[in-house]
Amino acid sequence: MQYIEMTGKTLLKLIDLTGLSQEELRKAGVRDDSLVRVTRLGDLELRKPHKWDAIGGLLGEFDHKLRHETGLDWA
């Protein structure tokens, strides 16, 4: 599986892609310094001490905007 990883701060800047509000992401545990990853299918996962937790997903045509905004490619 390929991912793009980013901080919670970056994810919160891309809020229009998530279909979730900042409040919902914060309730899920996303903080500015959180480690978050997105799968190619658009699944959002938050890094916890011993695992990754699914917290939602991205909507629409997120691929180009995600790569452009993060400066990263799928790895």
Residue ranges and their predicted role:
Residues M1-R26:
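Negatively charged, low-complexity tracts enriched in Asp/Glu with abundant Ser/Thr
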Residues L17-H68:
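Acidic, low-complexity, intrinsically disordered interaction modules
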